[in-house]
């Protein structure tokens, strides 16, 4: 299965999230990827793409909570 191309806006959100994540700004990465996730859902993208981004969001949330030494979810 081949992923559908991202729109320009979606590509920006993916890259913004990656840069935030790489710089330890996990909450900002979470927010950027959540916007991407919502965009993918609105245009009925493949479920595998939606779930991949959902996994990125969950990973960012986990690391954000770890960074804050919070033992419970967001």
What would you call each of these model-derived segments?
Residues 1-11, 47-49:
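TPR-adjacent "capping" and linker segments in tetratricopeptide-repeat scaffold/adaptor proteins
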Residues 19, 57, 64-65:
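Residue-level signature for tetratricopeptide repeat
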Residues 21, 26, 33-34:
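Inward-facing hydrophobic residues that define packing positions of alpha-helical scaffold repeats
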Residues 26-27, 71-72:
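TPR-repeat structural position
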Residues 31-57:
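Short, charge-rich amphipathic alpha-helical segments embedded
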Residues 44, 67-69:
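Short coil/turn linking the two alpha-helices of tandem helical-hairpin repeats
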Residues 47-48, 72-74:
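Acidic/polar-rich alpha-helix caps and helix-coil junctions
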